[in-house]
Structures are given as structure tokens and as C-alpha cells.
Amino acid sequence: MEKIFLNGEFVSPSEAKVSYNDRGYVFGDGIYEYIRVYNGKLFTVTEHYERFLRSANEIGLDLNYSVEELIELSRKLVDMNQIETGAIYIQATRGVAERNHSFPTPEVEPAIVAYTKSYDRPYDHLENGVNGVTVEDIRWLRCDIKSLNLLGNVLAKEYAVKYNAVEAIQHRGETVTEGSSSNAYAIKDGVIYTHPINNYILNGITRIVIKKIAEDYNIPFKEETFTVDFLKNADEVIVSSTSAEVTPVIKLDGEPVNDGKVGPITRQLQEGFEKYIESHSI
């Protein structure tokens, strides 16, 4: 029987109940992580939970969990649910309290829930590429926190779906930031460009992996801003995330990226990613 982790216990889905006064439900007052499982093993799990605890710290949320404890509960959940290929979703909120914008006084216990999902890798997208659209970035100014507040992302993703695209690449003014659920990259003249780490983007774990792969393959990797026009005139465009891995974007706003085919640097990064899965899954 499927198990869900809820506030220190492994329970059945029917037992996994939270209060209508949970601050995650009322205010989106919480954080989350999404961790890939390959061959029954957790991929880059330490990096994910280090970011999880950083996000908690940034919003003043004391979880009383170490990275090691979070990894252990994740392993148990994967084993209990017999997940071979899939993911773990974990979120923490500020807990249950009467509705008030300020933090609860006295403090209440944070609420933590984690569950697993079985699903295959996006082989078709990886091999053939996807369509993308560009859209104005309307999100808040702390995108470096992996917050439950995802309405801006949801609206951007729905815009992509409306125009038969898989991802919406966002921009503030003319400056490209990131995808609605991914980091974005423009490849030009053999150089990978992506937005620098700051409050406008999430420092994606797959982004970190791609940077390391680029170093291994001696591909220049520049963390600097670029424009929508630069993106549309790139030789290759990719988006990356825990679920998307290294996905090529072959069409933007209805127009082909370069010749509309998956490029050679994208293929190198995908090759390196396969090796990284083997060496960084525990």
C-alpha cells in the first residue's frame, strides 16, 4: 500500500489530512523540493535538501531536520512505495494557525509532507525537442526561494499550453530570466549563456549539473544576462529542470531556433547528464 510522509509518520493516502488553517493552504507560506529517482536511487539528493533548508532559512522557518535526516526519510519512502523511476515531492509550511498575515505567536510546529510519484523520463522531448514561447516575467522578486507561491509560474505555463508549447521562457523587460518551471539557456558560437544567480531565478540543481558537465566537456559557460532577441537568434536553446532534464527547444514563438533541429552542444550535455545520473544517484 502506498505511503505518504506526514509530520514524522508514514501514513496511507486516506490518512494524510491537513487542516484548512494550514498556512500553506491559506497563504502559500511554505517551501518545497522535487527530487528525481532513477533506478530506485535518489539523484543529487544532497544538493536538493541543502537548497530546501536554505529556502526554509530565507523565510524564517525552522524545520529541525538535517540534510541526512531528510535523505533517510526519502529513502524509506522510495523503498516503501517501490519507486524505480519517478520522483519525491516534499513541502514544508509554517504550520496550522488562525488566519493572520504575521507569523504565528507563539510559534507552531511546521507541517511537512512528502510523497512519491512513478513516471518515465521525457524521452520524446529529449530526442526531438519541444516548442517554447516567451512571456513577461510577472513573478515576485525572491525567485531564488523555492516557494509554494507559484501563481506567476502557473499563468506562464498555461500561456505556453494555450499556444501548443511545452515551456514558457520568461523575461523582465528584454532580459531573459528563466522558464516557468525550468532554467533557460542560449547557446551561441559554442558558448552556453544563462542568467546569473540572483533573486530573479532559482538556482536549479540541474543548472548546477549542466555547469559541471560544460566544464568537463570544455564548453564555455557564461552566467550573464541576455535579451529575448539574443535567445531567438541563438544556435541552440535548452531548458533544464529536475523533470525536464536537458530539453532542447527547437521552436520559439512559432519560429524555428536556428535550423529547427537539436544541436550538437545539447547532445553533449545530454550525454554528460547520463553519466552524471550514474555517478550521483544514491
Curated annotation (Swiss-Prot):
The modification N6-(pyridoxal phosphate)lysine is found at residue 146. Its cofactor is pyridoxal 5'-phosphate. GO terms for biological process: carboxylic acid biosynthetic process; D-amino acid metabolic process. Disulfide bonds: none annotated. Its EC number is 2.6.1.21. Substrate binds at residues 32, 99, 101. GO terms for molecular function: D-alanine-2-oxoglutarate aminotransferase activity; pyridoxal phosphate binding. SUPFAM superfamilies: D-aminoacid aminotransferase-like PLP-dependent enzymes. The active site is at residue 146. PROSITE patterns: AA_TRANSFER_CLASS_4. The keyword Transmembrane helix does not apply. One of its GO terms (cellular component) is cytosol. It comes from the Bacteria. InterPro entries: Aminotrans_IV, Aminotrans_IV_CS, Aminotransferase-like, BCAT-like_C, BCAT-like_N, Class-IV_PLP-Dep_Aminotrnsfr, D_amino_transT. Keywords: Aminotransferase, Pyridoxal phosphate, Transferase. Pyridoxal 5'-phosphate binds at residues 51, 178. It catalyses: D-alanine + 2-oxoglutarate = D-glutamate + pyruvate. CDD domains: D-AAT_like. Acts on the D-isomers of alanine, leucine, aspartate, glutamate, aminobutyrate, norvaline and asparagine. The enzyme transfers an amino group from a substrate D-amino acid to the pyridoxal phosphate cofactor to form pyridoxamine and an alpha-keto acid in the first half-reaction. The second half-reaction is the reverse of the first, transferring the amino group from the pyridoxamine to a second alpha-keto acid to form the product D-amino acid via a ping-pong mechanism. This is an important process in the formation of D-alanine and D-glutamate, which are essential bacterial cell wall components. Belongs to the class-IV pyridoxal-phosphate-dependent aminotransferase family. Homodimer. This is D-alanine aminotransferase. It comes from Staphylococcus aureus (strain COL). The gene is dat.
